[in-house]
């Protein structure tokens, strides 16, 4: 169970007879899912959103499947209490390790980022590189999704354990980050890839660094763009698209609200008001302690 400093129940004020006005839930381990939120603002400007960052337990990319399932169920239980109409797993690790299991356990649609990203990649190239967290790379989720679409495509995957901590520490411009990125990209460049997939929603935040290191002909796929396109289609199919003006986005985290707010302003263009949700018994990660 959880407790929240102020987010409880249906604070959006919609009725059960107005499911279209219910919010979309978006979650990630940290700020990476803000790349998906930005796409929702662009593609679905009428939708209200609740964003959750599980910052007390990041990074997800080094966790086991059992841990990820526990975390995801905690978040989805909380989202259910917020009366969301849909949830977007704005986290590739969760999409790889938990999506197929938990989507059978809840009565609202849950979308992941991997399949939309894989479909977009196959449309662009035949020699595809995927950079992701170690857990996503180990799962082979992108390779499997791509090969289900086109088994003739070649796929190379690289796990990038240092990227999420560097991004969460706002070290995008640090020369060390460039050197780390160079080391991760080098084996893919040697394979002469024609397409690179951001296999973690944090990675678009590194776009200037990654683009500067890649050959100019390499196309970049940001699954955040394509999962929101899938959201649009799903909402239309279910008759859940909102035609009313949206309510302000609500932000909540399991870790330090102030730290998330400070990080989020750079990517959102405004300072988000962030509230704390305490999942009982959650140990704060060492990274979150370092950031505090």
Swiss-Prot record:
Pathway: Cell wall biogenesis; peptidoglycan biosynthesis. Keywords: Cell shape, Cell wall biogenesis/degradation, Isomerase, Peptidoglycan synthesis. It catalyses: L-glutamate = D-glutamate. This is Glutamate racemase. Provides the (R)-glutamate required for cell wall biosynthesis. The gene is murI. The active site is at residues 91, 200. Disulfide bonds: none annotated. It is an enzyme of class 5 (isomerase). InterPro entries: Asp/Glu/hydantoin_racemase, Asp/Glu_race, Asp/Glu_racemase_AS_1, Asp/Glu_racemase_AS_2, Glu_race. It comes from the Bacteria. GO terms for biological process: cell wall organization; peptidoglycan biosynthetic process; regulation of cell shape. Belongs to the aspartate/glutamate racemases family. Substrate binds at residues 28-29, 60-61, 92-93, 201-202. GO terms for molecular function: glutamate racemase activity. The keyword Isomerase applies. Its EC number is 5.1.1.3.
């Amino acid at each position: 169970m959880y407790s929240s400093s102020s987010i409880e129940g249906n604070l959006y004020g919609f009725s059960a007879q107005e499911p279209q006005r219910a919010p979309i839930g978006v979650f990630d381990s940290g700020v990476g899912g803000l790349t998906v939120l930005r796409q929702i603002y662009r593609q679905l400007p009428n939708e209200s959103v609740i964003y959750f960052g599980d910052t007390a337990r990041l990074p997800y990319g080094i966790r086991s499947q059992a841990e990820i399932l526990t975390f995801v169920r905690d978040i989805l239980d909380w989202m259910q209490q917020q009366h969301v109409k849909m949830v977007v797993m704005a986290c590739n690790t969760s999409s790889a390790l938990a999506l197929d299991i938990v989507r059978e356990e809840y009565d609202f649609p849950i979308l992941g980022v991997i399949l939309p990203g894989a479909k977009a990649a196959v449309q662009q190239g035949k020699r595809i590189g995927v950079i992701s967290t170690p857990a996503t790379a180990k799962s082979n989720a992108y390779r499997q999704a791509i090969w289900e679409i086109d088994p003739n495509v070649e796929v190379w995957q690289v796990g990038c354990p240092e990227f999420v901590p560097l991004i969460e520490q706002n070290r995008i411009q640090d020369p060390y980050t460039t050197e780390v990125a160079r080391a991760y990209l080098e084996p893919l460049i040697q394979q002469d890839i024609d397409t690179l997939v951001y296999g973690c929603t944090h990675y678009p935040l590194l776009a200037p660094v990654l683009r500067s290191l890649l050959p100019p002909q390499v196309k970049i796929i940001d699954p955040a763009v394509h999962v929101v396109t899938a959201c649009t289609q799903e909402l239309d199919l279910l008759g859940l698209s909102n035609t009313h003006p949206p309510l302000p986005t609500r932000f909540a985290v399991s870790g330090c609200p102030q730290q998330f707010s400070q990080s989020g302003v750079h990517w959102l263009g405004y300072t988000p008001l962030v509230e704390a949700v305490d999942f009982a018994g959650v140990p704060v990660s060492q990274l979150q302690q370092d950031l505090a």
